[in-house]
Amino acid sequence: MKAVIQRVKEAKVSVEGRVVGEIGKGVLVLLGVEIGDGCAQADWMAEKIVNLRIFADNEGKMNLALPEVKGEMLAVSQFTLAGNCSKGRRPSFDTAAAPEEANRLYSYFMGQVWERGVPVQSGIFQADMEVSLVNDGPVTFILETPPKR
């Protein structure tokens, strides 16, 4: 499982011109589910992102996590994160999870974020989406779950 995390002042996702998810201060998470990912990877990713200390404290240091700043999450499914561009000019998506499994784990991930006390909004799985955001920093991280054993 891979994620791109961006600290934002605000973010929204629209489908066919209609806003389907919107947050204020928090993180935009682009989430890619790969073959072999399961609940353990989604749990790890939710725990890591919710508790990642990427917000400034009173001294300006990155020392606070989403719950401490009352931040929100906008989660957007992004199968292209599983893309392999090492050969040729067209990406290969051989490692992307099947849509049914990816949707199940995407939904499970969002549930785990909610259970950890962070409000989460989302896009629509497999929809053609437009994502708008105001970066804060910018601060961007790429996370990948530890290798499966």
UniProtKB/Swiss-Prot annotation:
Listed A to Z, the keywords are:
Cytoplasm, Hydrolase, RNA-binding, tRNA-binding
Motif Gly-cisPro motif, important for rejection of L-amino acids: residue span? 137-138
Q: Which gene encodes it?
A: dtd
**Can you tell me which family this protein belongs to?**
Belongs to the DTD family.
Q: What is this protein called?
A: D-aminoacyl-tRNA deacylase
- An example Gene Ontology molecular-function term: D-tyrosyl-tRNA(Tyr) deacylase activity
First-listed, main subcellular location of the protein, grouped into a coarse class = cytoplasm
Listed InterPro entries: Daa-tRNA_deacyls_DTD (IPR003732), DTD-like_sf (IPR023509)
The superkingdom listed in its UniProt entry is Bacteria
Instruction: Name the reaction it catalyses.
Output: glycyl-tRNA(Ala) + H2O = tRNA(Ala) + glycine + H(+); a D-aminoacyl-tRNA + H2O = a tRNA + a D-alpha-amino acid + H(+)
Q: Which HAMAP family match?
A: Deacylase_Dtd
- Gene Ontology annotations of biological process type: D-amino acid catabolic process
Keyword set includes RNA-binding: yes
